[in-house]
Amino acid sequence: MKASSGKPREFRPAVLLLILGLLLRDSRGSSIQGFLADVEVHGSSRLTRTHTLRYNVRAHSLEGSEKTQLLVLIYVDEELFLKYNGDSRETEPLGCWIKGHGGNETCARETNNLLKVEEKLRGMMAEVINQKSQEEGLHTLQATLGCELLSNGSTRGFWHLGYDGQNFLTFDQKTLTWTVDGPSTQQNKMFWKTHAPRADLVKTFLDDICPAHLQRYLASLRNGLQDTGPPMVTVTCRNYPVGRVTLTCRAFNLYTREATLVWLQDGKPVQQKTFRSETILPSGDGTYQARVSIRVLPGQEPQFSCNLRHGNHSIMQTAVSGHAAEDSQDVASSATASAGSALPVVLAVALARAN
C-alpha cells in the first residue's frame, strides 16, 4: 500500500458508533447485553478487587470490495468468553460456565443478530472509504469500550474509537465530551460537535448498563463454579539423594483469579505468595490453580504445613501427607520410564516381522 500524503485523516468514525449502537442497544434486543441479562443472579458478593467488562469491536474492509469482516470479542477480567467471527458467521462461547448456562441458545441468538449487523456494516464501511478517499488497501475501524467495578464499590468506564490501528476519539466521563486524539483539523472538530453520539446515552451505558451486567456475570460465575466443589490443596515432597527437600503446595478448583498460599513452620508463616490475575494459571475448565514451593532440610517436613486462603475458604494441609502423593507420582513415572525403554524393542520386533 502506498504511503499516505501525511494529511490529517478525514473520515467519520461515527459510522462505527452506529455499529456499536446495534450491538449495545437496550438489553431486550441486544446480542451482547441480552446475553449478559440472561444470566441469572443468585445474590451479590463483596468485591475484593477490580473487575472489568471489555468489548473489542473491529471491522475490516478492502477498498473496492464488498467484503467486510466483523470481529467482536468480549472479555471479563481480561479473559475472552464470547467471540463472533465474520468468517464463520457464528458466535462462539468460551468457558465451561457459559455452556452450562444456555450457551448454545445464546450463541444462536447472537449469531442471528450479528449477521444483521454485518449486512449493515458493508454499506457503512463503503461510506467511510468514500469519505476518506484514500488509496486502495486494507482499512480497519476499531472500538474498545467497557467498564470497571472497583473494590470500593465505585465504577468507571472507557470508550475509545480508532481507525487503522490509531486512536481517534476518547470519551471523557468527567466532562461528558468526546476528545480528538492527536492533531485534527477544525473541520473534524466541527463535525463532531454536530454528529458525535449523545453524551447522556454514552454516560448511561458506561455508568449503569455495563456495570449492572458485569455484576450479574460475576454473581453467576461465582455460583456456577462453586457447584464444582470447594478448593483443593495437595502437598508433595521430593527427596534428593544429597541436599535439601522440596515441598510443593498446589491449590486447585479456584473459582476466581485471586488466592494466597502460605507455608508455615510450626504454625508461623515463613513464605507467602499472593496470586493475582496476571500470575494465577487457568485449569482449562473455568477454574484456576496455583502452586508454591519451599526447600527444607531433610527431617524437617513434619514442621511444615501449607495454608490456602481463597474467598471464604481457609484450607490447611501438612507436608507429611504429601509423601503418599509423591510416592504414587514416582511409581507412575517409573512405569512410564519402563514403558518408554521397552518401546524401541517392540518397534524392532515389529519391523523385523514386517520384513
Curated annotation (Swiss-Prot):
<feature type="propeptide" description="Removed in mature form">
    <location>
        <begin position="331"/>
        <end position="355"/>
    </location>
</feature>
<feature type="region of interest" description="Alpha-2">
    <location>
        <begin position="138"/>
        <end position="229"/>
    </location>
</feature>
<feature type="signal peptide">
    <location>
        <begin position="1"/>
        <end position="29"/>
    </location>
</feature>
<feature type="region of interest" description="Connecting peptide">
    <location>
        <begin position="324"/>
        <end position="329"/>
    </location>
</feature>
<protein>
    <recommendedName>
        <fullName>MHC class I-like protein MILL2</fullName>
    </recommendedName>
</protein>
<dbReference type="InterPro" id="IPR036179">
    <property type="entry name" value="Ig-like_dom_sf"/>
</dbReference>
<dbReference type="Pfam" id="PF00129">
    <property type="entry name" value="MHC_I"/>
</dbReference>
<keyword id="KW-0732">Signal</keyword>
<feature type="region of interest" description="Alpha-3">
    <location>
        <begin position="230"/>
        <end position="323"/>
    </location>
</feature>
<keyword id="KW-1003">Cell membrane</keyword>
<comment type="similarity">
    <text>Belongs to the MHC class I family.</text>
</comment>
<dbReference type="InterPro" id="IPR050208">
    <property type="entry name" value="MHC_class-I_related"/>
</dbReference>
<dbReference type="InterPro" id="IPR011161">
    <property type="entry name" value="MHC_I-like_Ag-recog"/>
</dbReference>
<feature type="glycosylation site" description="N-linked (GlcNAc...) asparagine">
    <location>
        <position position="312"/>
    </location>
</feature>
<feature type="region of interest" description="Alpha-1">
    <location>
        <begin position="46"/>
        <end position="137"/>
    </location>
</feature>
<feature type="lipid moiety-binding region" description="GPI-anchor amidated aspartate">
    <location>
        <position position="330"/>
    </location>
</feature>
<keyword id="KW-1015">Disulfide bond</keyword>
<dbReference type="GO" id="GO:0009897">
    <property type="term" value="C:external side of plasma membrane"/>
</dbReference>
<dbReference type="InterPro" id="IPR037055">
    <property type="entry name" value="MHC_I-like_Ag-recog_sf"/>
</dbReference>
<keyword id="KW-0449">Lipoprotein</keyword>
<dbReference type="InterPro" id="IPR011162">
    <property type="entry name" value="MHC_I/II-like_Ag-recog"/>
</dbReference>
<keyword id="KW-0325">Glycoprotein</keyword>
<feature type="glycosylation site" description="N-linked (GlcNAc...) asparagine">
    <location>
        <position position="152"/>
    </location>
</feature>
<dbReference type="InterPro" id="IPR007110">
    <property type="entry name" value="Ig-like_dom"/>
</dbReference>
<feature type="disulfide bond">
    <location>
        <begin position="96"/>
        <end position="107"/>
    </location>
</feature>
<dbReference type="Pfam" id="PF07654">
    <property type="entry name" value="C1-set"/>
</dbReference>
<comment type="function">
    <text>Binds to heparan sulfate proteoglycans on the surface of fibroblast (NIH-3T3) cells.</text>
</comment>
<feature type="domain" description="Ig-like C1-type">
    <location>
        <begin position="231"/>
        <end position="321"/>
    </location>
</feature>
<keyword id="KW-0472">Membrane</keyword>
<dbReference type="InterPro" id="IPR001039">
    <property type="entry name" value="MHC_I_a_a1/a2"/>
</dbReference>
<comment type="subunit">
    <text>Heterodimer with B2M (beta-2-microglobulin).</text>
</comment>
<feature type="disulfide bond">
    <location>
        <begin position="249"/>
        <end position="306"/>
    </location>
</feature>
<feature type="glycosylation site" description="N-linked (GlcNAc...) asparagine">
    <location>
        <position position="104"/>
    </location>
</feature>
<dbReference type="InterPro" id="IPR003597">
    <property type="entry name" value="Ig_C1-set"/>
</dbReference>
<keyword id="KW-0336">GPI-anchor</keyword>
<feature type="disulfide bond">
    <location>
        <begin position="147"/>
        <end position="210"/>
    </location>
</feature>
<dbReference type="InterPro" id="IPR013783">
    <property type="entry name" value="Ig-like_fold"/>
</dbReference>
